[in-house]
Amino acid sequence: MVTIRADEISKIIRERIEQYNTEIKIVNTGTVLQVGDGIARIYGLDEVMAGELVEFEEGTIGIALNLESKNVGVVLMGDGLMIQEGSSVKATGRIAQIPVSEGYLGRVINALAKPIDGRGEISSSESRLIESPAPGIISRRSVYEPLQTGLIAIDSMIPIGRGQRELIIGDRQTGKTAVATDTILNQQGQNVICVYVAVGQKASSVAQVVNTLQERGAMEYTIVVAETADSPATLQYLAPYTGAALAEFFMYRERHTLIIYDDLSKQAQAYRQMSLLLRRPPGREAYPGDVFYLHSRLLERAAKLSSQLGEGSMTALPIVETQSGDVSAYIPTNVISITDGQIFLSADLFNAGIRPAINVGISVSRVGSAAQIKAMKQVAGKLKLELAQFAELEAFAQFASDLDKATQNQLARGQRLRELLKQSQSAPLTVEEQVITIYTGTNGYLDSLEIRQVRKFLVELRAYLKTNKPQFNEIISSTKTFTGEAEALLKEAIQEQMELFLLQEQVEKN
């Protein structure tokens, strides 16, 4: 017969009791009351934070935006077709954040930083909050380095500096995206990381931009964040913040970044849709009262950091679409007041064949010549004034029948200056080439040519200087100044090229 030893049993029981540990896990849960149109109303979730992520039973993630006395309004990051009334929801205790790393360069991702280009996962060991506070006053320094766009009209008269916010505004089909993509192409070799955020665009338009960047080798230093027109409003609203978080990751690592939001009108519309469905009170044009804050907290994240923080920068080029040139609508006026200047693209100029269709008269940069190299300041100083006087004269000349010689000369000069500002798409020019072009125009060397010959002559002159006078480019790039020696070289080249050009034209005529 087996004897039961009490001491052994009590020892085992004692050990088991010591090993037992109570682990209580408290989960903040709620119940779905109503779901539809990308919005869910949740009962419960008493301790949820504003902007906290919540998880539904079937895996959909949402953001708690409306914290009301009886329920919580949640916007869904997906279609939410499988969510049922009465199903449970749990609060995650996290605010929206995305993984960040160098691995994102050259990739196309969505607003949740998931790759959508079919090239596999992106590895990252770090994450950033989608909504981070903007750098404070002490963390910044004033903008002083140029960010060259490669477009003469912008770099000479509406200069953009690293850390600036410059709005690109105009009607649909006036070349807003073209200005932005040309700026990305021009950053090749400039050690600038570019982030292109497409909000509510056609998938075909985004694909076209990505193809252009790939063909020109610009995807190496670019990240594309895309939420197309068929994406849920929540993701269209989040996409710009995702792009900003990625750009900030590089900015705080002492790098220079350029971010393009294409476009903020679509983001505002997505936010309006969400707000109205959440039954927030509508304001002007049915936008909610905090639509200004929507854009200001995004654009304030662009900055030029102080030397203590490593002098990184984030330059923002937001795009806003106007309806038949109405700049006084709600969203355009909001974004104009937040940014440091605007580039206004006009449909009339575009249709008249002036491309890029920049209306120089009402475009401004509030950073101004602080964001230009000395050589550009030296040659471009009188360009804006001459063009403004020409526009005034041209309007007056339509009514005058006989004009004196001086007025005729001024009109002829203005037409040639307007001609030299024209550029083909995806053909950005270096600063040296821009200096050559502007100097030739403002000093009257083009006055003897017919208007149709201007562009051809300038292309040949730039090529001639590159091959026959390489020291000109060296002087400008090393000293950043248009020295007397550089001017002498340029004058020489213009005379030599002009003789060649006129001979060539003569031969072609005969």
UniProtKB/Swiss-Prot annotation:
Cellular localisation: Plastid, Chloroplast thylakoid membrane
Gene designation per UniProt: atpA
Name of the protein in question: ATP synthase subunit alpha, chloroplastic
InterPro entries the UniProt entry points to: ATP_synth_asu-like_sf, ATP_synth_asu_C, ATP_synth_asu_C_sf, ATP_synth_F1_a_nt-bd_dom, ATP_synth_F1_asu, ATPase_a/bsu_AS, ATPase_F1/V1/A1_a/bsu_N, ATPase_F1/V1/A1_a/bsu_N_sf
Enzyme class: translocase
Enzyme Commission number, as recorded: 7.1.2.2
MF annotations from Gene Ontology: ADP binding; ATP binding; proton-transporting ATP synthase activity, rotational mechanism
Assembly and interaction partners: F-type ATPases have 2 components, CF(1) - the catalytic core - and CF(0) - the membrane proton channel. CF(1) has five subunits: alpha(3), beta(3), gamma(1), delta(1), epsilon(1). CF(0) has four main subunits: a, b, b' and c.
